[in-house]
Amino acid sequence: MPRLIKKVGSLRRGKRGVPKGVIHIQASFNNTIVTVTDVRGQAVSWSSAGACGSRGTKKSTPFAAQTAAENAIRMLIDQGGMEQAEIIMKGPGPGRDTASRAIRKSGVVLSFVRDITPMPHNGCRPPKKRRV
């Protein structure tokens, strides 16, 4: 028999905080996106380096990733919400470590950090050799 999951009110409406959640960091070479979800996967807040005001090549810097991580969890801290979180990182970008350091400094207790970067198992066939 399936267990019933109690419905949690949305933080966007300001009803209540989320005591435990998951912080997703997607770090590409061009941008860093930080999404905070509850345990069920419902997005609570998000931020990106581009949304924080960085434009062009400055979006791919570690400082922009740090700013994005701080903005994503600032709303949760203001609501008195998240006490414990898990970090799931994806991508090879330069801002992944800086974003996780910013989250660690915010006071949220981290249970674990997981890296789910997709790795090819031999990948696509390369293009044929160039003959000059």
Swiss-Prot record:
Alphabetical keyword list: Chloroplast, Plastid, Ribonucleoprotein, Ribosomal protein, RNA-binding, rRNA-binding
An example Gene Ontology biological process: translation
GO cellular component, one term: ribosome
Gene Ontology terms, MF aspect: rRNA binding; structural constituent of ribosome
Compartment(s): Plastid, Chloroplast
One Pfam family cited in the UniProt record for this chain: Ribosomal_S11
Claim: Chloroplast is one of the keywords in the record: yes
Quaternary context: Part of the 30S ribosomal subunit.
HAMAP family in the cross-refs: Ribosomal_uS11
Similarity comment text for this entry: Belongs to the universal ribosomal protein uS11 family.
Protein name per Swiss-Prot or TrEMBL: Small ribosomal subunit protein uS11c
Organism expressing this protein natively: Huperzia lucidula
Primary gene name: rps11
